[in-house]
């Protein structure tokens, strides 16, 4: 099977959307020989910070000498990014080979699996074939009925920041959403949580008590920022000092979640030296999360797509670029709470460029442009995200800031274009 045929198999399934429930993925994995049963997992659910926390943990475990799988979604530039071993995305030939193994299993099923179920099963088979010691597994949506929750009790279950997102599927209160996310907490695991709101904490404590699961929570007061700049930050947590290249105070809280997870794994007998923890955090890369792509003019990229993320971006812009003229290049999906996102971001905007993310669910740039006019600032409409980025750069003074925000679907297109541009101009 070629990589093109493999992608056709994955994208050609009848069910593109979400169909909660574990029966299909269970059957599919069983037909594949249950590859997940031979693997150890760190399972991560939450609204925001899942990917960053997963990247930090994978980096730490790799530095500690473990062959480490990482499963995340969605991807930015290439589908293969969704599954990696030791920081390297799945090679085309290996992905095609696991898809070939899936084909007869799918054909034998009465109820065909969804795209996400296929990707999850393909990843499990590939991680098993690659002999992973541990897989850092990010939930696709929710937790309880997410395809990744087909695994037995993981070594550690991690709950990152919980907020309101995907309310049409997960429920419209924080408590309901927390119950869905807490579906990954299985008897026999250890749980770690981000510093949550009181109602979310109450749910996590109740469920962990019911299931006899030890719960470690990040102590926000034990995070002490030391230095902070556009090249990264240093901080101490519970007295030990670390360097983190990711920007924003929320990343310190995500790093503290990773550190508490290390403590939980050590309690289970995992060997993770302090030096590996420091090296893992110092080396972590996680693109499109307040990522600095250019200087003079400054170009910041963030794939955040809900009001919490937008507030974080606004805070970071104020923190790292005070007093500078900021143009916001915005693209959003029509089904997101973009009015609340834009209200948070507008505090930092001098001007706007509206673009259309590469998704069938995108809000057209012209419609977004009309909406942005209410803020009383200059608005330009340029549907193509990469062209919008070029336009913004062409009109910016060297000291100005451009921040592209609102959707990972837009971030990927811009990142690919700007990096290609940079490589061509520098002769790489």
Predicted regions: what they are:
Residues 131-133, 323, 397-399:
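Short, high-confidence coil segments that cap the C-terminus of an alpha-helix
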Residues 194-216, 230-232, 298-299, 307, ...:
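C-terminal helical cap/extension that packs against the catalytic core
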């Amino acid at each position: 099977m070629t990589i093109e045929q493999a992608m056709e198999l994955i994208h050609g399934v009848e069910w593109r959307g979400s169909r909660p429930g574990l029966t299909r993925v269970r059957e599919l994995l069983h037909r594949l020989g249950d590859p997940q049963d031979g693997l150890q997992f760190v399972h991560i659910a939450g609204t925001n910070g899942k990917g960053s926390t997963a990247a930090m943990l994978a980096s730490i475990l790799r530095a500690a000498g473990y062959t480490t799988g990482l499963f995340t979604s969605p991807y930015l530039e290439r589908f293969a990014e969704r599954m990696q071993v030791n920081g390297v995305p799945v090679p085309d030939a290996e992905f095609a080979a696991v898809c070939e193994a899936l084909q007869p299993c799918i054909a034998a099923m009465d109820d065909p699996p969804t795209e996400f179920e296929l990707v999850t099963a393909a990843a499990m088979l590939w991680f098993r074939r690659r002999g992973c010691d541990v897989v850092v597994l990010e939930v696709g949506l929710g937790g309880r009925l997410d395809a990744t929750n087909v695994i037995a009790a993981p070594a550690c279950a991690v709950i990152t920041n919980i907020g309101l997102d995907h309310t049409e599927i997960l429920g419209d209160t924080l408590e309901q959403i927390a119950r869905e996310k807490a579906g990954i907490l299985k008897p026999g695991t250890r749980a770690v949580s981000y510093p949550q709101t009181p109602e979310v904490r109450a749910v996590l404590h109740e469920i962990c008590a019911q299931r006899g699961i030890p719960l470690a929570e990040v102590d926000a007061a034990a995070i002490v920022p030391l230095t902070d700049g556009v090249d990264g930050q240093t901080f101490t947590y519970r007295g030990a000092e670390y360097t983190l290249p990711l920007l924003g105070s929320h990343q310190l809280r995500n790093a503290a979640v990773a550190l508490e997870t290390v403590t939980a794994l050590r309690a289970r007998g995992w060997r993770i030296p302090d030096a590996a923890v420091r090296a893992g955090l110092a080396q972590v890369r996680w693109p499109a999360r307040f990522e600095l792509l250019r200087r003079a003019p400054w170009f910041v990229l963030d794939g955040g797509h809900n009001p919490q993320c937008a507030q974080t971006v606004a805070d970071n812009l104020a923190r790292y670029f005070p007093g500078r003229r900021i143009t916001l290049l915005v693209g959003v999906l029509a089904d997101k709470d973009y009015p609340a996102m834009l209200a948070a971001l507008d505090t930092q905007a001098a001007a706007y460029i509206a673009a259309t993310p590469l998704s069938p669910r995108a809000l057209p740039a012209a419609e977004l442009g009309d909406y942005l006019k209410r803020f009383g600032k200059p608005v330009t409409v340029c549907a193509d995200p990469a062209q919008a980025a070029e336009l913004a750069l062409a009109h910016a003074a060297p000291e100005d800031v451009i921040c592209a925000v609102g959707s990972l679907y837009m971030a990927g297109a811009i990142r690919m274009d700007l990096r290609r541009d940079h490589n061509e101009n520098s002769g790489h």
